[in-house]
Swiss-Prot record:
Keywords: ATP-binding, cAMP biosynthesis, Glycoprotein, Lyase, Magnesium, Manganese, Membrane, Metal-binding, Nucleotide-binding, Repeat, Transmembrane, Transmembrane helix. It is a multi-pass membrane protein. Its EC number is 4.6.1.1. GO terms for cellular component: plasma membrane. Binds 2 magnesium ions per subunit. Is also active with manganese (in vitro). This is Adenylate cyclase type 7. It holds the Pfam family AC_N. Residues 455-476, 502-545 are annotated as: Disordered. Disulfide bonds: none annotated.
Length: 1078
C-alpha cells in the first residue's frame, strides 16, 4: 500500500492546485473582454476629444472635459499595455477594473457638467443619461467584477447619477419628477439586463471550464488506460503479438458500437510467427505433488508464486522469456522475440540457476524437492490461438523434444540435447546423459543427450550455507508447507498485477464541479494518489498535468480570436473547420432560451414605462405598444407553455411547443426575429408622429405648445429618452446570448442605420430642437452657439448609438466565440469519453481473457485488493479434451509453411470451442488453458464457497453441464472435419471434487487450479479412448442420478493413483449434434 494512498477526496481535501487553476481560468477568460472594453473606451475618448476640439468652438472653454479625457485616455492605454502583456496578477486586475470604472464614472460626470462653460444648461444635464447607462452596462458585461461587485458598482453609478440630477433642479415640478422616474427606469432596466447577462455568462463560463477540465481528465485517464492496457497485454503477450490483437479488439468493439455487421471471414485471425535458432527449456519441480497435498490454499498459492516469481527473475537475468506454467512445470524460451546468438548458454545458465535455487530451498527447509530441467535448441512457432484466455505458447517438434528431455532428465541436473551442446561452444563441461535409457521416444529418434556439470558444484560450500541448514534443522518440527511458505516469503516476489495497481494519480482538481461547489466524497475507484514527494516520476506527471491544464485554460482566452491560429476555427471569423460541425452547432438545441424572451419582455416593459411617463399620449402610442404586447405575450405563452399548462395534462401537444422552441432552430430564430424586431421598432415608432411645433412659431408663442401638450418641455428634452429607448432595444438584442452572430449583426446594423436616418434626416424635430426649442440658439452664421449647450445634442445622440452598437457587436462576437468553444469542448469530451469507454472495455476484455470475471473483480474493483488471490472449492467439475490425432496431423514442411497451416487448423478448432462458451447454457463453464491440442475447462468456479452455497443439486448440475459441453465440443469437431476433410476425434476425461484456484506469476499472471481432482481428470483424458468421455466412479454415480447412462470400462492403471474403476458416458449422437446446432 502506498504511504499516502487516498481512496476518497473529501470536502476538506481540495488542494491549492484546484483554486489556482480555477482562478487562472477566471482571470484568463476575462482578458479578452477586458481588452475589448479598454479598446472601446479609448476609441470613445478619442472621438470625444476630436468633437470637443475641432467641432464646437473654443476648446479652452472646455478645459475640464479635455483634461479628464486626456487623463482617461492615457490611463486606458497604460492599462491596455499591462493587460496585453499579462503582467497583472489577480489583485492587479481587480485594481485595474476599479480604475477603469472610476475613470468612466468621472468622465461621465465631467460630461454632465462642463464647469468651464458660461452656464450649466439643463439640457446637457438630462442628456447624459446614455453615458451613465453605458457605465452600468459595461460593469456587468466587460469588467472582471464578481456578481456582487458588479451589482454594487452598477447601483452606485445609477443612484449617484440620479442624486446629481435631483440636486441640480431648482424646482421639482411634475415633469422633473417624471424625468427622474424615467431615468430610474432606464437604470433599473440596465442593471437587470446586465445582471441577467452576467449570470448566464458565468454559468456558461463554469460549464466551459468544467467541460475543459473533464476533457483533460478524460485525456489523462485515456493515457493511463492505454498504459494499463499495454502493461496488461505485455504481462500476458509479447509486444509483437499484443499490438495486432489490441487493434483487432478495438475494431471489433467499434463495429459493434456502429452496428456494422461485416461478413465474417472463413478463418479466424491467426497470431502466430515462426522463429528459428532458439533454445527451449522445460523444468519440473520433483516432489511438489506431495508437498502440494499438505498445503492450505493460501500456502499453495504463496509457494507457487514465490517459486515462479524467483524463476521469472532468473529468466529476466538470463534473457529468457517465460512461456507458460503448467501446474508445477515451468517452461521458457531464449531467442524470442529477438534472435540471440547465445540463446543456448542463456537457457543452460537459467537451468543451473533454477536447480541452485531449489537446492537452497531444500537445504533451508528440509523439504525433499528438486528441479529437473530439459533443454533443446531448434525452431518454434510462437503466438496465440483461440478466442478466449489467451496464453502465449510455442509449438514445434523441437518443443515436444524439449518436453521429453525434461521427463527423461535427472533431478537436480540440466539435461541437454546434442543440438544444444553444439551452440554452447564448450562454455560448460558435460557428461553423458543416457536419456535414451529413460525415454522410448529419445531412443526411437536416436537422440543423444548430455548432463551439464554446474561449475558451482566444484567449489567448496560457503559457511553461510551450513548456518542456514542448521537453522532449517531447528524448524523441522513444523509442517513442510509451513517451513516452505515462511522461507519463500522472505524472497519477496512481486504480487500478481502489482504493476497494474500502482496506477497514476488523478489530480484533486478532477473533483471540480460546475458553479464552484465543493464536491462531496468522490471515490477514485482504481486510481490512487501516490506519494509524489518520493517519486520524481509522480512529480513530472503531476507537472505535466498542470501544464496541460494551464495550456488549455489559456486557450480559452479570446483576446485575438480572429487573428489566432486554431485547428478548429477558420482564420477569419469563428467558423468551424470540421465538415458538418458548423451545421451541427447551428442546429443544436439551446437550453433555457425561454429566459432570453422573458428578459426581452422586461426591456419592452421598461420602454413602455418611459413612453408613458414622458411622451405625448396619443392613440398611436396605445395601438403600437398594444400590438407589441400581444406579440410578446404570444411568444411568452409558447415559450412557457409547459409551465402555464402544467395543470392540464390533456393539452400535452401544446405543452410540447415549449420544448420545440429550444430544439427547433427555425421556430426559435423566427420568434427571436419577431421579438427583437418589435422592440427595435417600438423604441422610435412614435417619434415621427409627435405634434412638433410649426417652423413659424416663435419663442413667445411657447404657451401655445404647452396648451396643446400640457407638458412643460419641448421634444428636444425628450430626445435623450428616445436615445435610451433605442439603446435598451439594442441591449434586448444582446440578451439572446446563444443566437446567431450574423442575425444579431444584421438586426443591429439595420436598426442603427434607421435610427441615424431618423435622428439626422427627419426635418421637423431637428428644426424644433436645434432651431427654436430653446429660444434663440443659433448665431449669426447659422451655427449652433456654444453658449446654448455644451454639447451638440444630435452629435452626442449619434455618438451614443454608435458606441453601444460597436460595443454590442464586439461583445456578441466574444459571446459567440465562447459558445462555440463550449460546444467544441463538449464534443471533444463526448468523443474522448467514448474513446475512454472503448479503452475500458478493451481492458476489461483483456483482463477477462486472462482471468475469470469474478477473479478479475478482485484486482480491478474499488478495494484495490493487493492480497494473494486464492480460493478453495468443495466441488468443481474439471474437463480435459484433447485431439490426439493432431500430433500425427502436425508436420513441418514447405507445403504447410513449416507447420503454420497446421496451427491455423488448430486455431479454428480451439476458436470454435471458445465460441461455445458464449452460449448462456455454458456460462458457468470456465476455460482454464490449452496445452498443445488439449483443451482444459472447469465448471463451478464462479460459485462462492461457503455453507450457503453448498447446494448439492447445483454442484451436481455443473457436472451435467460439463458433459453437455463435452458433447458440444465433439459436435463442433465433427463440423470442422466435414469442412476440412479430416477425421479428428475428441478424447475427453472428466472428474469432480475439491480444487484450489489462484493467480500466480507477477510478470505474466496466470489463473490456474490445482488439486487431486485436476490430476485425475487429466489421467481420465490421457487413458481414455477416442470419441468417448471417461469419468471416475464417483462422477458416474452423479451422472446416473442426472439421467445419464454410463458404461463400465473396468479397472485401469492410473499413474500415481494405482488402479481405478472408470466409466464411459453413453453420449447420444443425435443429442450432441443438436447441442452443436444450438
Amino acid at each position: 500500500m502506498p504511504a499516502k494512498g487516498r481512496y476518497f477526496l473529501n470536502e476538506g481535501e481540495e488542494g491549492p492546485d484546484q483554486d489556482a487553476l480555477y482562478e487562472k481560468y477566471r482571470l484568463t477568460s476575462q482578458h479578452g473582454p477586458l481588452l475589448l472594453m479598454l479598446l472601446l473606451v479609448a476609441i470613445a475618448a478619442c472621438t470625444t476629444l476630436i468633437v470637443i476640439t475641432f467641432s464646437y468652438g473654443d476648446p479652452s472653454r472646455h478645459r475640464a472635459v479635455l483634461g479628464t479625457a486626456f487623463f482617461t485616455l492615457a490611463m486606458f492605454v497604460l492599462l491596455y499595455a499591462l493587460v496585453y502583456v499579462e503582467c497583472l496578477d489577480r489583485r492587479g486586475l481587480r485594481i485595474s477594473a476599479l480604475l477603469i470604472w472610476g475613470c468612466l464614472v468621472t468622465l461621465g460626470y465631467v460630461l454632465v457638467f462642463d464647469f468651464d462653460s458660461p452656464r450649466k444648461d439643463t439640457l446637457c444635464l438630462w442628456g447624459r443619461c446614455p453615458s451613465s447607462s453605458f457605465v452600468v452596462f459595461v460593469v456587468y458585461t466587460l469588467l472582471p467584477f464578481s456578481m456582487w461587485g458588479a451589482v454594487t458598482a452598477g447601483l452606485v453609478s445609477s443612484i449617484s447619477h440620479l442624486l446629481v440630477l435631483a440636486m441640480h433642479q431648482e424646482d421639482f415640478t411634475s415633469p422633473v419628477g417624471l424625468k427622474l422616474l424615467a431615468t430610474a427606469v432606464v437604470f433599473v432596466c440596465g442593471n437587470l439586463t446586465g445582471a441577467f447577462h452576467k449570470h448566464h455568462m458565468q454559468d456558461a463560463s463554469h460549464d466551459l471550464f468544467t467541460y475543459t477540465v473533464k476533457c483533460i481528465q478524460i485525456r489523462r485517464k485515456l493515457r493511463i488506460e492505454k498504459r494499463q492496457q499495454e502493461n496488461l497485454l505485455l504481462s500476458v503477450l509479447p509486444a509483437h503479438i499484443s499490438m495486432g490483437m489490441k487493434l483487432a479488439i478495438i475494431e471489433r468493439l467499434k463495429e459493434r458500437g456502429d452496428r456494422r455487421y461485416l461478413p465474417d471471414n472463413n478463418f479466424h485471425n491467426l497470431y502466430v510467427k515462426r522463429h528459428q535458432n532458439v533454445s527451449i527449456l522445460y523444468a519440473d519441480i520433483v516432489g511438489f505433488t506431495r508437498l502440494a497435498s499438505d498445503c492450505s490454499p493460501k500456502e499453495l498459492v504463496v509457494v507457487l508464486n514465490e517459486l515462479f516469481g524467483k524463476f521469472d527473475q532468473i529468466a529476466k537475468a538470463n534473457e529468457c522469456m517465460r512461456i507458460k506454467i503448467l501446474g508445477d512445470c515451468y517452461y521458457c524460451v531464449s531467442g524470442l522475440p529477438v534472435s540471440l546468438p547465445n540463446h543456448a548458454r542463456n537457457c543452460v545458465k537459467m537451468g543451473l540457476d533454477m536447480c541452485e535455487a531449489i537446492k537452497q530451498v531444500r537445504e533451508a527447509t528440509g523439504v525433499d524437492i528438486s528441479m529437473r530441467v530439459g533443454i533443446h535448441s531448434g525452431n518454434v512457432l510462437c503466438g496465440v490461438i483461440g478466442l478466449r484466455k489467451w496464453q502465449y505458447d510455442v509449438w514445434s517438434h523441437d518443443v515436444s523434444l524439449a518436453n521429453r528431455m525434461e521427463a527423461a532428465g535427472v533431478p537436480g541436473r540440466v539435461h541437454i540435447t546434442e543440438a544444444t551442446l553444439k551452440h554452447l561452444d564448450k562454455a560448460y563441461e558435460v557428461e553423458d546423459g543416457h536419456g535414451q535409457q529413460r525415454d522410448p521416444y529419445l531412443k526411437e529418434m536416436n537422440i543423444r543427450t548430455y548432463l551439464v556439470i554446474d561449475p558451482r558444484s566444484q567449489q567448496p560450500p560457503q559457511p553461510s550455507q551450513h548456518n542456514s541448514k542448521n537453522k532449517g534443522n531447528a524448524t523441522l518440527k513444523m509442517r513442510a508447507s509451513v517451513r516452505m511458505t515462511r522461507y519463500l516469503e522472505s524472497w519477496g516476489a512481486a504480487r500478481p498485477f502489482a504493476h497494474l495497481n500502482q496506477r497514476e494519480s488523478v489530480s484533486s482538481s478532477e473533483t471540480l464541479v460546475s458553479h464552484g461547489r465543493r464536491p462531496k466524497a468522490v471515490p477514485l475507484r482504481r486510481h490512487r494518489t501516490p506519494d509524489r514527494s518520493a517519486s520524481p516520476k509522480g512529480r513530472s506527471e503531476d507537472d505535466s498535468y498542470d501544464d496541460e491544464m494551464l495550456s488549455a485554460i489559456e486557450g480559452l482566452s479570446s483576446t485575438r480570436p480572429c487573428c489566432s491560429k486554431s485547428d478548429d476555427f477558420s482564420t477569419f471569423g469563428s467558423i468551424f473547420l470540421e465538415k458538418g460541425f458548423e451545421r451541427e452547432y447551428r442546429l443544436a438545441p439551446i437550453p433555457r432560451v425561454r429566459y432570453y424572451f422573458a428578459c426581452a419582455s422586461l426591456v419592452f416593459v421598461c420602454i413602455l414605462l418611459i413612453h408613458v411617463l414622458l411622451l405625448y399620449s396619443m392613440k398611436t402610442l396605445g395601438v403600437s405598444f398594444g400590438l407589441v404586447a400581444c406579440v410578446l405575450g404570444l411568444v411568452l405563452g409558447l415559450c412557457f407553455a409547459d409551465v402555464f399548462l402544467r395543470c392540464c395534462p390533456a393539452l400535452g401537444k401544446l405543452r410540447a411547443i415549449a420544448e420545440s422552441v429550444e430544439t427547433q432552430p427555425l421556430l426559435r430564430v423566427s420568434l427571436a426575429i419577431l421579438t427583437i424586431g418589435s422592440l427595435l421598432v417600438i423604441a422610435v415608432v412614435n417619434l415621427p408622429l409627435m405634434p412638433f411645433r410649426d417652423r413659424g412659431l416663435t419663442a413667445g408663442n411657447e404657451t401655445g405648445l404647452r396648451a396643446v401638450s400640457g407638458w412643460e418641455m419641448s421634444p428636444c428634452y425628450l430626445l435623450p429618452y428616445y436615445t435610451c429607448s433605442c439603446i435598451l432595444a439594442f441591449i434586448a438584442c444582446s440578451v439572446f446570448l446563444r443566437m446567431s452572430l450574423e442575425l444579431k449583426v444584421v438586426l443591429l446594423t439595420v436598426a442603427l442605420v434607421a435610427y441615424l436616418v431618423l435622428f439626422n434626416v427627419y426635418p421637423s424635430w431637428q428644426w424644433d430642437c436645434c432651431g427654436h426649442s430653446l429660444g434663440n440658439l443659433t448665431g449669426t452664421n447659422g451655427t449652433l452657439s456654444s453658449s446654448s449647450c455644451s454639447w451638440h445634442l444630435k452629435t452626442m445622440t449619434n455618438f451614443y448609438l454608435v458606441l453601444f452598437y460597436t460595443t454590442l457587436i464586439m461583445l456578441s462576437r466574444q459571446i459567440d466565440y465562447y459558445c462555440r468553444l463550449d460546444c467544441l469542448w463538449k464534443k471533444k469530451f463526448k468523443k474522448e469519453h467514448e474513446e475512454f469507454e472503448t479503452m475500458e472495455n478493451v481492458n476489461r476484455l483483456l483482463l477477462e481473457n486472462v482471468l475469470p470475471a469474478h477473479v478479475a473483480a478482485h484486482f480491478i474493483g474499488d478495494k484495490l485488493n493487493e492480497d494473494w488471490y486464492h480460493q478453495s472449492y468443495d466441488c468443481v467439475c474439471v474437463m480435459f479434451a484433447s485431439v490426439p490425432d493432431f500430433k500425427v496431423f502436425y508436420t513441418e514442411c514447405d507445403v504447410n509453411k513449416e507447420g503454420l497451416e497446421c496451427l491455423r487448423l488448430l486455431n479454428e478448432i480451439i476458436a470454435d470451442f471458445d465460441e461455445l462458451l458464449l452460449k448462456p447454457k455454458f456460462s458457468g463453464v470456465e476455460k482454464i488453458k490449452t496445452i498443445g491440442s488439449t483443451y482444459m475447462a472447469a465448471a463451478g468456479l464462479s460459485v462462492p464457497s461457503g455453507p450457503e452455497n453448498q447446494d448439492l443439486e447445483r454442484q451436481h448440475a455443473h457436472i451435467g453441464i460439463m458433459v453437455e459441453f463435452s458433447t458440444a465440443l465433439m459436435s463442433k469437431l465433427d463440423g470442422i472435419n466435414r469442412h476440412s476433410f479430416n477425421s479428428f476425434r475428441l478424447r475427453v476425461g472428466i472428474n469432480h471434487g475439491p480444487v484450489i484456484a489462484g493467480v500466480i506469476g507477477a510478470r505474466k499472471p496466470q489463473y490456474d487450479i490445482w488439486g487431486n481432482t485436476v490430476n485425475v481428470a487429466s489421467r481420465m483424458e490421457s487413458t481414455g479412448e477416442l470419441g468417448k468421455i471417461q469419468v471416475t466412479e464417483e462422477t458416474c454415480t452423479i451422472l446416473q442420478g442426472l439421467g445419464y447412462s454410463c458404461e463400465c470400462r473396468g479397472l485401469i492403471d492410473v499413474k500415481g493413483k494405482g488402479e481405478l474403476r472408470t466409466y464411459f458416458v453413453c453420449t447420444d449422437t443425435a443429442k450432441f449434434q443438436g447441442l452443436g446446432l444450438n
